[in-house]
């Protein structure tokens, strides 16, 4: 065997041993294993990445470069609409499923040209771990779709960027719908047309969203101010969602919107710099928020709250949590932010017997989360 061949084999063995899932999921998706101990594969083309994610094998898929889907499926020029005006900083809307026609009939019609690859994400099937190597694993121009019964999936240490950011309905970064046991960890999302994360109307069951950096800075937004509106939308029919340690930055709304039948434990997250609101809680949204920091968030929760909300308002009230979560809830911290005080307790029994993420005092969040959330921070 040639010396060069031996070096290549040694390099592959080193790579396979060097990259693996870091840590373990806390909260509702505790126990998720993804691709488990499967031999790591290293896709080199967009087609190979799509194939690995969409097959029936248990896989550990390692990204070592940028996979740019821009232009891979062509572009479409069509008539859309401008619901928020035609100023240069305003998002335009694609007339997807006749949205402009049905919901914005009075909005000006405009020509839109968008990249087809962004509209629908890459299908991710069961028993997959998708891992980035260092800070080099990027999916550009296309998101991920965990749907149709997919389960036991880990997405860790990657970035998803640049999905038709000018256009509403241009595509989502991560879609979860009709799934179970999904862990999204240390992912960075930026410059997305629609939702950075969406859990659709079917049951997504047990999901943990941890240590991610949702970056809402954009040249285009529905509020025409550079603050992305479409952040995180949790709309499932039977969803248990843990959000812990996330950095949610520069949004003007829906960060998150919670409704359907969704139990959300929002713990030790850092919201920073919003031109609108953070939480929007619709019917069927049940939110417990503890140990978070809200900095420069004028409207923490949009009125009215049509679901139920426990904001962990004070140490005495928070004692009720110990019965159902196994710990006294932590108060939240605020800086230059609006009010956030509601103590609905009727839904707290829904946490009983579940896997619950631990909670730290909010004082540790501001100094640690921005520097530890997102890709390359493991």
From Swiss-Prot:
Q: What is this protein called?
A: Probable pectin lyase B
Instruction: Give the record's GO CC terms.
Output: extracellular region
Q: Name residues in a coiled coil.
A: none
Q: Which reaction does it catalyse?
A: Eliminative cleavage of (1->4)-alpha-D-galacturonan methyl ester to give oligosaccharides with 4-deoxy-6-O-methyl-alpha-D-galact-4-enuronosyl groups at their non-reducing ends
In the record, the note on similarity to other proteins reads: Belongs to the polysaccharide lyase 1 family.
- The UniProt gene name for this protein comes to pelB
Superkingdom, taxonomy of origin? Eukaryota
Question: Which N-terminal residues, if any, form the signal peptide?
Answer: 1-18
What PANTHER family does the entry give? PECTATE LYASE 18-RELATED (PTHR31683), PECTIN LYASE A-RELATED (PTHR31683:SF16)
Can you tell me which residues are glycosylated? 127
Q: Name one GO biological process term.
A: pectin catabolic process
Q: Where is the active site?
A: 254
List the cysteine pairs that form cystine. Answer: 81-100, 90-224, 321-329
What is the role of the protein in this entry?
A: Pectinolytic enzymes consist of four classes of enzymes: pectin lyase, polygalacturonase, pectin methylesterase and rhamnogalacturonase. Among pectinolytic enzymes, pectin lyase is the most important in depolymerization of pectin, since it cleaves internal glycosidic bonds of highly methylated pectins.
Q: Does the keyword ATP-binding apply?
A: no
Note the InterPro entries from the entry. Answer: Pec_lyase (IPR002022), Pectin_lyas_fold (IPR012334), Pectin_lyase_fold/virulence (IPR011050), PEL (IPR045032)
Intracellular or extracellular location(s): Secreted
Report the EC number(s), separated by commas if there are several: 4.2.2.10
Q: Which Pfam families match?
A: Pectate_lyase_4
């Amino acid at each position: 065997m040639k010396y060069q061949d031996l070096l290549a084999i040694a390099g592959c063995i080193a790579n396979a041993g060097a990259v693996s899932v870091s840590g373990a999921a806390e909260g509702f998706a505790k126990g998720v294993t993804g691709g488990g101990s499967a031999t790591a594969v290293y896709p080199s083309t967009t087609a190979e990445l799509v194939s690995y994610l969409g097959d029936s094998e248990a896989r550990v898929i390692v990204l070592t470069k940028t996979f740019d889907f821009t232009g891979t499926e062509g572009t479409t020029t069509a008539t859309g609409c401008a619901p928020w005006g035609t100023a240069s900083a305003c998002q335009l809307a694609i007339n997807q499923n006749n949205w402009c026609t049905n919901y914005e009939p009075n909005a000006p019609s405009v020509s839109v040209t968008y990249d087809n690859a962004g509209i629908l994400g890459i299908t991710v099937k069961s028993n997959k771990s998708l891992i980035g190597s260092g800070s080099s694993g990027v999916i550009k121009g296309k998101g991920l779709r965990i749907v149709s019964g997919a389960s036991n999936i880990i997405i860790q240490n990657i970035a998803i960027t640049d999905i038709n950011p000018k256009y509403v309905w241009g595509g989502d970064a991560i879609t979860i719908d009709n799934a179970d046991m999904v862990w999204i960890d240390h992912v960075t999302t930026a410059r997305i047309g629609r939702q950075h994360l969406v859990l659709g109307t079917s049951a997504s069951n047990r999901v943990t969203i941890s240590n991610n950096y949702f970056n809402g800075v954009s040249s285009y937004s529905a509020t025409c101010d550079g603050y992305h509106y479409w952040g995180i939308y949790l709309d499932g029919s039977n969803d248990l969602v843990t959000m812990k340690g996330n950095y949610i930055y520069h949004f003007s709304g829906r960060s998150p919107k919670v409704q359907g039948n969704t139990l959300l434990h929002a713990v030790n997250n850092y919201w920073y710099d919003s031109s609108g609101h953070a939480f929007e809680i619709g019917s069927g949204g049940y939110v417990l928020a503890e140990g978070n920091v809200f900095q420069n968030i004028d409207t923490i929760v949009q009125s009215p709250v049509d679901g139920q909300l426990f904001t962990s308002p004070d140490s005495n009230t928070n004692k009720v949590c110990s019965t159902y979560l196994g710990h006294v809830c932590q108060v939240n911290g605020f800086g230059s932010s609006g009010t956030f005080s509601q103590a609905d307790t009727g839904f707290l029994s829904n946490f009983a017997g579940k896997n619950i993420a631990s909670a730290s005092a909010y004082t540790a969040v501001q100094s640690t989360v921005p520097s530890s959330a997102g890709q390359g921070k493991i």
